[in-house]
Swiss-Prot record:
Keywords: ATP-binding, Ligase, Nucleotide-binding, Purine biosynthesis
SUPFAM superfamilies: SAICAR synthase-like
Reactions that this protein is recorded to catalyse: 5-amino-1-(5-phospho-D-ribosyl)imidazole-4-carboxylate + L-aspartate + ATP = (2S)-2-[5-amino-1-(5-phospho-beta-D-ribosyl)imidazole-4-carboxamido]succinate + ADP + phosphate + 2 H(+)
Keyword Nucleotide-binding among UniProt keywords: yes
EC number(s) on file: 6.3.2.6
Pathway info: Purine metabolism; IMP biosynthesis via de novo pathway; 5-amino-1-(5-phospho-D-ribosyl)imidazole-4-carboxamide from 5-amino-1-(5-phospho-D-ribosyl)imidazole-4-carboxylate: step 1/2
Protein name: Phosphoribosylaminoimidazole-succinocarboxamide synthase
Source organism of the structure: Pyrobaculum calidifontis (strain DSM 21063 / JCM 11548 / VA1)
Family: Belongs to the SAICAR synthetase family.
GO molecular function, one term: phosphoribosylaminoimidazolesuccinocarboxamide synthase activity
Any GO BP annotation: 'de novo' IMP biosynthetic process
One matching Pfam family: SAICAR_synt
Keyword ATP-binding: yes
Length: 240
């Protein structure tokens, strides 16, 4: 890569400016509770980077524009620089996670009649609060037109991922996306991995929820390895 300048370091990734674009390096660490719990997880970075690579490529093939450029083994991806508002977009197919806290009458894993799209202001110190669509526009995070475009992209991406993993008999529960502007165009950014979605296979988590529930970082890495295998198998079935 040659020249590299650290631009940002978060809980799961470090981002470097290079001549070719931004290099997103995935860490061998896992956190929960907005960083309150943190453990070393050797091998996690490489697994998350490769999984994100495969899923970005898959989504691009399904018409979802992303910031992804190329995989940089073993644990990084090269991406286009983007202007990213502090906004998380969650698509839920079933009741789980924080949804159950605000809607206590819902039973875990109850399917929704149609996917629910949520917007959260991204701020760990505030625990990423849920905000209204009107809030998104009034705060200047997105224009009304951009908001509609983001909802459409999020639903299309989430539905494509759900379809992918259904081919290996896994239940895609929900997913968290981030979007940014590249040359005036809204694109999917950040990562798409077990850190950003919930996937149940045979009733077991192959995502970060396993760590949230158990605190077992070693076991999480083993499940991320299995997630990568499942992803490759699912993709091979898409090509048939």
């Amino acid at each position: 890569m040659g020249f590299m300048e650290l631009v940002y370091e978060g809980k799961a990734k470090a981002v470097y400016k290079t001549r070719e674009g931004l290099l997103m390096v995935f860490k061998d660490e896992v956190t929960a509770g907005d960083g309150a719990r943190r453990d070393k997880a050797p091998g996690k970075g490489a697994l998350a980077a490769e999984t994100s690579t495969l899923l970005f490529q898959y989504l691009q093939g399904r018409g979802v524009t992303t910031h992804y450029l190329m995989f940089v083994p073993p644990n990084a991806i090269l991406v286009k620089p983007a202007q990213v508002p502090p906004l998380e977009v969650i698509v839920r197919f079933k009741a789980y996670g924080s949804y159950l806290k605000r809607m206590p009458k819902a039973k875990p894993l109850t399917p929704f009649a149609k996917p629910i799209v949520e917007f959260h202001y991204k701020d760990d110190s505030l625990h990423d609060p849920l905000i209204l669509e009107d809030d998104v526009v009034e705060a200047g995070l997105l224009t009304a037109g951009e908001l509609a475009a983001v909802k459409d992209m999020a639903l299309r991406a989430a539905s494509a991922l759900r379809e992918l993993y259904a081919s290996v008999d896994c239940d895609f529960v929900d997913v968290k996306f981030e979007f940014g502007r590249v040359g005036g165009e809204l694109v999917l950014v950040d990562e798409v991995s077990g850190d950003t979605f919930r996937l149940l296979c045979g009733g077991e988590h192959f995502d970060k929820e396993y760590y949230r529930k158990t605190g077992d970082a070693v076991g999480l890495v083993e499940r991320y390895a299995k997630l990568l295998e499942l992803t490759k198998l699912a993709l091979s079935r898409q090509k048939v």
